[in-house]
Design a protein with these regions (language model features):
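Acidic, polar-rich low-complexity tracts and alpha-helical solenoid repeat scaffolds
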Residues: 1-161
Length: 161
């Protein structure tokens, strides 16, 4: 128990290194499976939830940092990984929103040979987002992005033959 607690109190906040947090999760999980009858079991389960939340937040912040500095390709990969790793994240709407915007910005900043595919990819993200969050506060902005994508696709499709 003390061993697990030490790790818990050493665990850093989300924006710092997460190795200790991962070790704490392992230690607490082992404690829970070894001593399921412990009188402290609920406290340990709460700690586990909190530590998992920290890792989830860290994963989101990493992806968001790529977005903020304009590394849109890396942002898309990081946001997708975050969703895969933490499907229960409370930030799902934000992640899907930033993925769509990142895809759009990547498309607009791409060399011409890559633009068509990237505008099409942006539309895919857009439809996923709108399917999941039809009433989102981001809807109008993303509708505009989708219109721009469609305009590009319509203008350039004919010339590709």
């Amino acid at each position: 128990g003390m061993y697990a607690l030490c790790y818990y109190y050493m665990a850093p906040s989300p924006e710092r290194d997460q190795t200790i947090t991962s070790q704490a999760i392992i230690a607490i999980t082992e404690f829970i499976s070894r001593y399921p009858e412990s009188e402290h079991i609920n406290e340990y389960k709460e700690m586990l939830d909190e530590l998992s939340g920290r890792l989830m937040e860290k994963s989101y912040l990493n992806a968001y940092t790529y977005y903020k500095i304009g590394r849109y390709k890396s942002a898309i990969v990081a946001f997708k990984n975050s969703m895969k790793q933490y499907p229960e994240t409370p930030r799902k709407e934000e992640i899907m929103y930033y993925t769509t915007v990142s895809a759009y910005r990547l498309a607009t900043n791409s060399v011409e040979s890559k633009q068509m595919d990237r505008y099409l990819a942006t539309l895919d993200y857009y439809y996923s987002f709108i399917g999941e969050y039809p009433e989102s506060k981001h809807k109008r902005e993303l509708d505009n992005i989708a219109d721009n994508c469609r305009d590009y696709i319509d203008k350039n499709r004919k010339t590709e033959q």
